[in-house]
Swiss-Prot record:
This is Casein kinase I isoform gamma-3. Serine/threonine-protein kinase. Casein kinases are operationally defined by their preferential utilization of acidic proteins such as caseins as substrates. It can phosphorylate a large number of proteins. Participates in Wnt signaling. Regulates fast synaptic transmission mediated by glutamate. Residues 22-35, 394-416 have a biased composition (Polar residues). Signal peptide: none annotated. Residues 1-16, 347-369 have a biased composition (Basic and acidic residues). It comes from Homo sapiens. Belongs to the protein kinase superfamily. CK1 Ser/Thr protein kinase family. Casein kinase I subfamily. Residues 43-313 form the Protein kinase domain.
């Protein structure tokens, strides 16, 4: 034991302090002698701030820099492991604008851990903060950035396949990137260029649905393999969601998931672009263009950006990052990381504790993940997305965000359809947000 401790101390002494993005580390870490859970040589694990099919999302702290981070934990025995793949995609993306930094990946006890940059609220959170209405200026500033963001992702031979407002985040309040729209959660991403042949993936049909039904392209509903065009079409649907406040295919009722997805797809096809984009002709031009793209075709990103920059200029707007939420008080991350013992293997104990805490004081639980520097009378009405911190919260909803209009959460939830290896129906609390959501049935689909 004495020799092992000395060896460990020596190896820790040899570890250089990471700056920027650090690499993949294969040495396991866990509880220190003080009972604090550590990831890598310098990341202390704090309270759980999110959960999902992947595992848990924890608040963390870099003990070398005193900066807060997000730590994503996935059980090593996961039936559909994806964290290692997501880490590879992040490294493939590198340090582009609006791409969260990844500081560490490696084992942590019985978990794989990925440490990421901590970001601010998602566009869905900000949409709620602005009474679910964005001005044309705000939507154009978002759209111009996200076309560039998607162009960058595509330039790295990846398609995103998970467009939704919860996956686009501003930076931490007070940071120099606080007004930059970031893209996060690459758990559903895919290489569309074969790394060996350097050729585009082949066109296929009868594919399972991957993405979020509310925003996915019409071709995705039809079971066609996704490519670059589908990411851009999904963005167009999201832009109209912000401008309209809702989409015509929200709130559709159906007896089964299959029927619901079918109805959503049918309604998308039946809704003329001119009706969907009424009073926004440039958005109509955008959608017509991306829907006409060939499966293999490279989109003209410059043309699409120019559609919106020209409109921006005609309206006399200035690209000053004065979004609709500027001037509203945004939440800030908690001011302290709680010491936390090693993760328990008994998941039921964690769930029981969380449910008990929630039942005791739901509003206090809502405030637990975030704490304002001063009294905040304008707390977000919506729950803050856990995947805002670069995490991939793969929550699968039986309604997939298209909730019945009589559901109190209708229009507030937007879970992606994932494609794990087997079907499983669960009835436990799944978080696609920082705070605990209401219980709802979830389902996973075959790939």
């Amino acid at each position: 034991m004495e020799n092992k401790k000395k060896d460990k101390d020596k190896s820790d002494d040899r570890m250089a302090r990471p700056s920027g993005r650090s690499g993949h580390n294969t040495r396991g870490t866990g509880s220190s002698s003080s009972g604090v859970l550590m990831v890598g040589p310098n990341f202390r694990v704090g309270k759980k701030i999110g959960c999902g099919n992947f595992g848990e999302l924890r608040l963390g702290k870099n003990l070398y820099t005193n900066e807060y981070v997000a730590i994503k934990l996935e059980p090593m025995k996961s039936r559909a492991p994806q964290l290692h793949l997501e880490y590879r995609f992040y490294k493939q993306l590198g340090s582009g604008d609006g791409i969260p930094q990844v500081y560490y990946f490696g084992p942590c006890g019985k978990y794989n851990a990925m440490v990421l940059e901590l970001l601010g609220p998602s566009l869905e959170d900000l949409f709620d903060l602005c009474d679910r209405t964005f001005s044309l200026k705000t939507v154009l500033m978002i759209a111009i950035q996200l076309i560039s963001r998607m162009e960058y992702v595509h330039s790295k031979n990846l398609i995103y396949r998970d467009v939704k407002p919860e996956n686009f985040l501003i930076g931490r309040p007070g940071n120099k990137t606080q007004q930059v729209i970031h893209i996060i959660d690459f758990g559903l991403a895919k290489e569309y260029i074969d790394p060996e042949t350097k050729k585009h993936i082949p066109y296929r049909e009868h594919k399972s649905l991957t993405g979020t039904a509310r925003y996915m392209s019409i071709n995705t509903h039809l079971g066609k393999e996704q490519s670059r065009r589908d990411d851009l079409e999904a963005l167009g649907h999201m832009f109209m969601y912000f401008l309209r406040g809702s989409l015509p295919w929200q709130g559709l009722k159906a007896d089964t998931l299959k029927e619901r997805y079918q109805k959503i797809g049918d309604t998308k096809r039946a809704t003329p672009i001119e009706v969907l984009c009424e009073n926004f002709p440039e958005m109509a031009t955008y959608l017509r263009y991306v829907r006409r793209l060939d499966f293999f075709e490279k989109p003209d990103y410059d043309y699409l950006r120019k559609l919106f920059t020209d409109l921006f200029d005609r309206k006399g707007y200035m690209f000053d990052y004065e979004y609709d939420w500027i001037g509203k008080q945004l939440p800030t991350p908690v001011g302290a990381v709680q010491q936390d013992p090693a993760l328990s293997s008994n998941r039921e104990a964690h769930q029981h504790r969380d449910k008990m805490q929630q039942s005791k004081n739901q509003s206090a639980d809502h405030r637990a993940a975030w704490d304002s520097q001063q009294a905040n009378p304008h707390h977000l009405r919506a729950h803050l997305a856990a995947d805002r911190h670069g995490g991939s919260v793969q929550v699968v909803s039986s309604t997939n965000g298209e909730l019945n209009t009589d559901d109190p959460t209708a229009g507030r939830s937007n879970a992606p359809i994932t494609a794990p290896t087997e079907v499983e129906v669960m009835d436990e609390t799944k978080c696609c947000c920082f705070f605990k959501r209401r219980k709802r049935k979830t389902i996973q689909r075959h790939k």
